[in-house]
Regions:
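Short, low-complexity N-terminal intrinsically disordered segments enriched in polar/charged residues
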Residues: 1-26, 30, 34, 38, ...
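Generic, low-specificity signal for short hydrophobic/alpha-helical stretches with a mild N-terminal bias
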Residues: 3-6, 18, 42, 46, ...
Length: 154
């Protein structure tokens, strides 16, 4: 990919992208949905599963309604992030996620193992999510029953 970026540019922009990935997890774990929304562009697309997602920032904000009362707490752990620059203002990423969910109701903690596949764009000097897809490898005692597959070969 010829994206006209120096190696130094790639390092600097990679750190900025890693920051937004970490901020997403932090804001989710801290029950700060209003901060999560700021990480997305207005015409974003989000898919957490085949029947759960959003098109556009207003629709995305609705998906976050009630997270503070549904969960007592969450702990999202990102690792293995890979960043490929399409251009100086667009990148695609893949990040491994382990997410533990403590429910408000009396239930065992739910655990999700999966991957985030993202498209990010740089708008007014800041990286934002254009598209975010959660692909699920497996779960334990998790509340969602329908998932986007990771695409693993048989």
């Amino acid at each position: 990919m010829d994206n006209n970026m120096t190696d130094i540019d790639k390092v600097v922009e990679s750190r900025a992208i890693e920051r937004i990935l970490s901020d997403y997890a932090y804001f989710l774990d801290m029950n700060m949905p209003e901060e999560m929304v700021k990480l997305f562009v207005d015409d974003c697309e989000v898919s957490y599963g085949p029947k759960f997602g959003a098109r556009g920032i207003a629709d995305y904000a609705k998906t976050l309604d009630g997270i503070g009362t549904f969960f007592k707490g969450t702990s999202h752990h990102n690792s293995g992030t890979v960043i490929d620059f399409v251009s100086p203002t667009e990148a695609v990423t893949r990040t491994i996620v382990l997410a533990v969910h403590r429910y408000a109701k009396d239930a065992p903690d739910g655990i999700l193992y999966g991957q985030y596949h993202d498209r990010l764009v740089k708008v007014d000097g800041a990286w934002k999510f254009k598209a975010r897809e959660l692909r699920t490898t497996m779960t334990t005692d998790y509340h969602v029953r329908s998932f986007n597959p990771i695409g693993r070969r048989d």
